Amino acid sequence: MVPRVIGMIHLAALPGSPQYGGDFAAVVDAAVSDAKVLETAGFEGLMIENFGDVPFYADDVPKATVAAMTHAIGRVGDAVSLPLGVNVLRNDAAAALAVAASTGAAFIRVNVLSGVMYTDQGPIIGRAAEIARMRAALAPNVAVMADVFVKHAAPPPGITIEQAAEELAGRALADAVIVSGTSTGRPPTLPLLRK
């Protein structure tokens, strides 16, 4: 089951990231604190992502990032009783699935699951076939939530949002489709949601 009201936990810069402050315990403690606040506020689930790791790798983060996220998400899971989600930015769905499998997280977010999007990391190509097979083998109970026309990106010409959403649900096997605005903090418009 994918929660409908999900609180977001943005991890501060992790070890190996350019803006890492050198205190990993503080990063984890902040995530745990945020999780407790969001649980008390009534959120149905929590999504945890490495938001502080700018600039992002396109689709293959360092192993240190995977290890740090696994530890942080494990600690958050020990502190709250909500279903957890994992997003490894910018688009490392394989790492997100591995972290989810090892921490017991319920779902992952994939910014580009199918097709291609043009981002500040360059073109990112979805790997739905690889992720579907990895999920079947490693974590069949982990839900995949996928963005359609993800924020901070542009689709190729000629592709409509309706087409992309149908492909995500029908052919890429996404369990849920996420519609975001054009950038973080800018929600999608009502006409876009109606499409």
Give residue ranges: language-model regions.
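Extreme N-terminal starter segment of soluble prokaryotic enzymes
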Residues: 1-5
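Alpha/beta enzyme core
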Residues: 6, 11-60, 67-83, 91-195
